[in-house]
Structures are given as C-alpha cells and as structure tokens.
C-alpha cells in the first residue's frame, strides 16, 4: 500500500498574522513559513517564538521556517501570502519560478496596491496565472489566535470546490474557517473596514461617546456594502465575518493598528509621523 502524501502549506511572511496562521495550520499539515529576516527564522526554528511580532507566545514546535522562498513554496499544495500589500507583487514574483501550477494562492493582506488600486487577487491573476486566487479574511487579531482564543475566518476562492477541499486543513482547535463564494466582497470587506476604523479611532481620540462610535460603525457598514456591491461584491457578504465581523474587531480592539492611527491623528500628529 502506498503511503498517503501529507499536505504541504506554505506561508509567505513572518509578521504577526503570517506567523500565527502558520503555527495554527502546522498542527495537522506540513507547514513552511518564509521570512526575509534570518533572525526571525532561526528563532522560530529553535525557540518556537517570534518575539518581534508576537512576544512570548509559544508557536507550534512542528512549524518550520526558512529564508529560501523557493524551498518554501516548492511542491506546496497551497500558498498563503501574508505580506503588506505594498510588497505583495514583489514577493509573489520572487516565488514564481518554484510555484506549482493549479494550486490555491491565498491573500492574507487587507489592502490595495498603491497606484494600480488592484486587489491582491487581481495581482495573483496578473503575476501568477494558472493558479487559483483567493482570500482568507475576517476578525482575526493575531495575538488572540496564537494564544488559543476562539476566532473565525472566511476562505473565499475563485474555485469553490478547491475552497471546500482546503477548509479542513485550515481549521484547527478554536480557529474555525468558513467558506464563501464572493471573493471580491470578502476581499473588499478587509480593505474598506480599515477606513472606518481610522474614523472610529479619531472619534475615540477626541473623546466622542459610544453613540458616536456605534453610528460610525453602522453607517460605515452601509456605505461599505453599497461601494462593495458597486465594485462587484455581494451586499450580504458585508453583513458577515468578512465585513461586520472584521469591522467590529478593528474598530474596537486596543490591538487595532488602524484604530490607533485614528487616535493619534486626533492628537494632531501627522500620518507620516504615526506610520514611522
């Protein structure tokens, strides 16, 4: 009897969300994390931590990391890309020669490409044709998930059968993955809620009350739904984890970077100063 081939999943990006996702998936899949920084790679392999992004949180000891992007993606059954949208195209292009054909390429990035305003799945089509573009998104604060707290996410691929096949590999412990066929809506939910979260943060920074925050979130959701539908998504997608769920977490959590930006803007700081 031939041995059953174990699935291999590659994650590109050694930040908080890439590392967290890799640690979760490595519980029942061979998982290889790629990061540029050799110190982060060594720490993950030897100490099973990533202090720069996740503090003392313990990572799954089965997780392996490398600085060799070709080795990470070679023979992978799926590749998840967790790098900032500003570096998405460059990182994907650098992996292209070793990327298997026909596999899911899944964006974990919540942004648009500067200049072209392309979604990450559009960049996948542009740079790596012959693969299945998709997105994993939702209310996913990395530090909570790596600590083992319950969370849910949405997986949307252009091939829904491929999403259903991949779903069990991403489910682990209290991290539950649902599927959705609206790739555009799911992707835009993760992008547009950032704008509302900055506005909510500005309100919080100026001392606005809970009523103001609630108004910004609910009216922001209505605006997101209309814009998302105009751009090709489905309005109902924004009422789920990819829209409302993600927005609640981003607009209310002290861990939210976009809310933090809004708070600092309310103090009179410039956006360049905050980002630096």
Residue positions per predicted region:
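NAD(P)-dependent Rossmann-like dehydrogenase/reductase catalytic/cofactor-binding core
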Residues: 193, 200-204, 229-239, 243, ...
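Rossmann-like NAD(P)(H) cofactor-binding subdomain of soluble oxidoreductases
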Residues: 59, 66-150, 166-168
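Hydrophobic anchor at the start of a short beta-strand
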Residues: 9, 31, 131-133, 177
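NAD(P)+-binding Rossmann beta1-loop-alpha1 motif at the extreme N-terminus of oxidoreductases
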Residues: 1-57, 62-67, 94
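Internal alpha-helical scaffold of NAD(P)-dependent oxidoreductase catalytic cores
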Residues: 87, 98, 123-131, 150-198, ...
């Amino acid at each position: 009897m031939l041995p059953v081939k174990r699935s291999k999943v590659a994650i590109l990006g050694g930040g908080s969300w890439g590392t967290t996702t890799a640690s979760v998936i490595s519980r029942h899949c061979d998982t290889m994390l790629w990061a540029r920084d050799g110190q982060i790679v060594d720490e993950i392999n030897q100490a099973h931590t990533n202090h720069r992004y996740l503090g003392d949180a313990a990572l799954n000891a089965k997780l392996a990391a490398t600085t060799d992007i070709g080795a990470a993606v070679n023979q992978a059954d799926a590749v998840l890309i967790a790098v900032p949208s500003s570096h998405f195209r460059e990182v994907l292009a650098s992996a292209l020669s070793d990327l298997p054909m026909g596999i899911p390429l899944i964006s974990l990035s919540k942004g648009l490409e500067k200049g072209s305003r392309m979604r990450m799945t559009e960049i996948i089509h542009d740079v790596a044709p012959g693969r299945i573009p998709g997105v994993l998104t939702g209310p996913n604060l990395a530090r909570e998930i790596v600590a083992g707290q319950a969370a849910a996410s949405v997986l949307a691929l252009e091939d829904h059968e491929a999403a259903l096949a991949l779903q069990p590999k991403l489910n682990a412990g209290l991290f539950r993955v649902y599927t959705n066929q609206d790739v555009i809506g799911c992707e835009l939910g993760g992008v547009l809620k950032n704008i509302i979260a900055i506005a909510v943060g500005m309100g919080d920074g100026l001392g606005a009350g809970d009523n103001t925050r609630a108004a910004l979130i609910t009216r922001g959701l209505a605006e997101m739904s209309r814009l998302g539908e105009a751009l090709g998504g489905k309005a109902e997608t924004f009422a789920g984890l990819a829209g409302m769920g993600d927005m609640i977490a981003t607009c209310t959590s002290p861990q939210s970077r976009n809310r933090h930006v809004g708070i600092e803007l309310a103090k009179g700081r410039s956006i360049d100063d905050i980002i630096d």
